[in-house]
Amino acid sequence: MHIKAKYQYTHFLYPFVIDSEKYPYFIESILKKTKEWTMVYHQYKSDEESYDFFLPYMRKFLFPSLFWDKKYIKKFKTQGVFRRSLELSKTTCITFKYNMARIKKGSITDFDGKVINYDISDIKIICFEGGICFIDFKTQIDEKSELIDFNKILDFNHYFRNLTPRIKGSAINRIVENSKTVNIPKFIRNITSEYESKSLDKMYFDKMFTYSYVCVDDWEKDTDFYKMQNDFYKFQYVMHSKSSAIFNEECDRLFDNVYSRWKYSMFGFSRESGVVFVSDKEKYDITRMPYNFEKRYLYMVLIALYQRISLINFSQNLMRQDKTAVKKLKKNLTQFTNSSWFGQITNSEHGMDIWKLWQKAFGLPELYDEVHKEYLEYYDYVVSNNQSRISMILMIFYVINISFSGIQMLTNVINLEDIQVYIIIAMVFSALSYPTYLIASWIKHKFEKKF
């Protein structure tokens, strides 16, 4: 079935991680670019429905500036740039909005080499505590005709998500260079290159995460979706239009990652994308759904991505850290559990259904349990090592105590001068025993690490 769309938009999310010591300087670099970036101060009256959608503690986590009074904001704005960046680096979530007067258009080639023109209507940087950030590009295909070929949407999503500094080769060559377009990889590189953690740059994906809405034409019957189902899965898994893949209708995994609460709407979830596929015959799908999908549900994706990257980061730190860093790791993991690990985020039943599906798609409960298990094993290792050292120290003191008790007894029956050499040898042995143990343990640790 050849599908046409009446309306569409796609958010492309580029995730990147900044080392904690560089995070304030990254924020400072954005604050200094006053002609390009503006910090978002959330105001309750501007979007009451979206803010009220989330539970109170979620509002404080996602929109902390919502709770800043006018006096504090005025004082904050008068502070120096670096002072502001230090304060913002301790904030749970901050957002910067790009001046779109500088960028509006872009072009990319499809599978057949045809040019797809698109508009960039919004660019944001969203950063969570710990330096986990996202660049969010909101795009729409620039189509002169009333209806958009669905294949064009598939190709656009598939190729645009490759436009990152991490992708090399042919994907980058699909950018069409001219005076009116923007080079997306270069744009990203200018923001992140000096600050992005190189050791973590592939901890998620080389490609951007795709979050896409499409309203299709001529979907009037339930049976129509069956005809469009394979194209929907291509949309969900960000495949290009020429892909010959035919999805297995009996695969349980496919059904686990889709959700339909209302007629003529289908949500799709994966670790690469989030999509909604709706009909223009349903009024809600063309009036409220586009708004809710990006104003409410998009934040769920950001939270899920933030949690997943944080947990993977913890896991990598457990493998890399020196075994003396247990206190710092415990502090960070406890803080994450207390302030950033959410089970309930909204009172909306539909919203909670979507949130649970995102948790499932990203495997968050399993990943959280795995990290805790790794930490407990790590903690047990450190504790057992420390216990061994304490036991060794106690043993040394015990040997010294016994030795000198014996010496004291001998002085009562033997001339003191005769045992001076013995005393010196015993003291030297006792003094050198623990340093010798430390050196031997260090050598053993190095050999174990090497082999």
Task: Walk through the language-model features, giving the residues of each.
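Secondary-structure boundary/capping motif
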Residues: 136, 317, 425-426
